[in-house]
Amino acid sequence: MDIFFCSEETAKLTFLKQGNVYEIMKSFTEQYPISFVASTQRVVHSPKVHSFGSVFYNAKEDKFYEEEPYKNIEVVDRIGSGDAYISGALYGLLKHNFNCRKALEYGNATSAVKNTIPGDLPSSGLDEIERIIKNHQSTGLQLEMDR
């Protein structure tokens, strides 16, 4: 099993890929022996306010996984948020028997939380990340980064 993490922008600039994020992600699995592709998606509203989400593709199932992005994150320091995403996604895959939905949830939550922490090393525990995921999935008025 191989996992490839690459943003849409990086795929276009580095690998000269064309098309939308779904076409690009799928093309990697057609070109290389890759089972999973994850692509983060950050929207910068201002230097200190971002939204963050991702798309996760399972080549064996030929299925894309997405969730509502974390919106209007008050960014303290974004350095390390990509590494935080990868650590969360890998945890979700390994802990939950290669469940792509869980990989997406843990990756997105871990990265979103990291954006609110100074320094390049996230200091969040598993309980905090799981609480963030639960809050993010709840309906109605919520504080997504309620820590």
Q: Model regions: which residues?
A:
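A short beta-strand/loop micro-motif in the catalytic core of glycosyltransferases
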Residues: M1-E8
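A generic structural signal for short hydrophobic patches within well-formed alpha-helices
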Residues: A11-K12, I129
